[in-house]
Curated annotation (Swiss-Prot):
PROSITE patterns: HAMP, HIS_KIN. One of its GO terms (biological process) is signal transduction. GO terms for molecular function: ATP binding; identical protein binding; phosphoprotein phosphatase activity; phosphorelay sensor kinase activity; protein homodimerization activity. It comes from Escherichia coli (strain K12). The keyword Transmembrane applies. The chain crosses the membrane at residues 16-35, 159-179. Residues 180-232 form the HAMP domain. The gene is envZ. The modification Phosphohistidine is found at residue 243. This is Sensor histidine kinase EnvZ. Cross talk between this and the Che and Ntr two-component systems can occur at least in vitro. NCBIfam families: PRK09467.1.
């Protein structure tokens, strides 16, 4: 089933929309009930009384219920005119007295015609003081009867409208506040889940709200505690394995130093293997370390890139640069970003053919740095798996490595609320670009400079 294009996504918006819809439906239903069972019967009764008044004023005789004909004296009719404020006008005089501004109502004319027994036209004039009813009956087709409704004032409807609007706004405001309170535990749960996704275990959440939400929060706290225990056990295990492995490696290195000069080539080969083992162990430790919470600070991204370029460049490796002119202030953990850039450069050196390019730049609200190589590249269908631990591309299977370098980069960038993007370099190799968020003030300034 397709979701409506403009349907709200969040539970807060959906619940608020549901309450507002139900409130509106309740108001419409109340209006229809009052209209059909109170207003329309009262209006019919009003028309009936008004019809009797008009008939009494327009005829000399009235027929009573028992059939007796009653003669209405002219003086009595004039007294009724005066008491009720009724006036008689010719067609031209009625136009000048306000008939031109009166609105014709077909249903009132139809009901009045039924009461008077002949064609009747009813118009209603709404002025600043009170409404006025104009009638022209078949009894006197050239005379308009003006009946002011002095007991009904236009201002009487304003409080009713204000009270109805106030009740509706109070109901919507109360619903909004209630839903906000109900959704607050879910917002806390969302933030905590995002932290767990980054490898940061938050403190146990406070269990409050509805019983279902409390149950979910309790289950989440149990899950987070289990994840933390698992992460701690893993870190302890890797630390123990690292210590236990480096001890025999150190003894092997000491043994190679006591080998004779004739076995120098063998000692050099053994030392290379020892260095590779140490590098693998260090990568495991780095991978575990990146899951921990890191203190952030404002730092210049270009300065961090420059330190890595200076450290990784040498007589065996030339790194081409295309850095953004000026500084790029980013909220980051400089040591972690330095580790990520170094891993990207080492990856480019290991799988490329000697050419490496490091560049940086800015866009509105974010900055980026990029490392390119001229190696065989990675097929597009394999790129989405490249950041998973221990996963390596087909072209890298013949080269030694753990498959953790880019996984470490991914973790570091995720901890900075950034994202990674793989592409093809200008020389056909692999291009890795990391995006980092930039404070709004800095992003606006960067846009002007660029």
């Amino acid at each position: 089933m397709r979701r409506l294009r403009f349907s709200p996504r969040s539970s807060f918006a959906r619940t608020l929309l549901l309450i507002v819809t139900l409130l509106f439906a309740s108001l419409v239903t109340t209006y229809l009930v009052v209209l059909n069972f109170a207003i329309l019967p009262s209006l019919q009764q009003f028309n009936k009384v008004l019809a009797y008044e008009v008939r009494m004023l327009m005829t000399d005789k009235l027929q009573l219920e028992d059939g007796t004909q009653l003669v209405v004296p002219p003086a009595f009719r004039r007294e009724i005119y005066r008491e009720l404020g009724i006036s008689l006008y010719s067609n031209e005089a009625a136009e000048e007295a306000g008939l031109r501004w009166a609105q014709h109502y077909e249903f009132l004319s139809h009901q009045m015609a039924q009461q008077l027994g002949g064609p009747t036209e009813v118009r209603v004039e709404v002025n600043k003081s009170s409404p006025v009813v104009w009638l022209k009956t078949w009894l006197s087709p050239n005379i308009w009867v003006r009946v002011p409704l002095t007991e009904i004032h236009q201002g009487d409807f304003s409080p009713l409208f204000r009270y109805t609007l106030a009740i509706m706004l109070l109901a919507i405001g109360g619903a909004w506040l209630f839903i906000r309170i109900q959704n607050r535990p879910l917002v806390d749960l969302e933030h905590a889940a995002l932290q767990v996704g980054k490898g940061i275990i938050p403190p146990p959440l406070r269990e409050y709200g509805a019983s279902e939400v409390r149950s979910v929060t309790r289950a989440f706290n149990h899950m987070a505690a289990g994840v933390k225990q698992l992460a701690d056990d893993r870190t302890l295990l890797m630390a123990g394995v690292s210590h236990d492995l480096r001890t025999p490696l150190t003894r092997i290195r000491l043994a190679t130093e006591m080998m004779s000069e004739q076995d120098g080539y063998l000692a050099e080969s053994i030392n290379k293997d020892i260095e590779e083992c140490n590098a693998i162990i260090e990568q495991f430790i780095d991978y575990l370390r990146t899951g921990q919470e890191m203190p952030m600070e404002m730092a210049d991204l270009n300065a961090v890139l420059g330190e890595v370029i200076a450290a990784e460049s040498g007589y065996e490796r030339e790194i081409e640069t295309a850095l953004y002119p000026g500084s790029i202030e980013v909220k980051m953990h400089p040591l972690s970003i330095k580790r990520a850039v170094a891993n990207m450069v080492v990856n480019a050196a290991r799988y490329g053919n000697g050419w490496i390019k490091v560049s940086s730049g800015t866009e509105p609200n974010r900055a980026w740095f990029q490392v390119e190589d001229d190696g065989p590249g990675i097929a597009p269908e394999q790129r989405k798996h490249l950041f998973q631990p221990f996963v390596r591309g087909d072209s890298a299977r013949t080269i030694s490595g753990t498959g953790l370098g880019l996984a470490i980069v991914q973790r570091i960038v995720d901890n900075h609320n950034g994202m990674l993007e793989l592409g093809t370099s200008e020389r056909g190799g692999l291009s890795i670009r990391a995006w980092l968020p930039v404070p709004v003030t800095r992003a606006q300034g960067t846009t002007k400079e660029g």
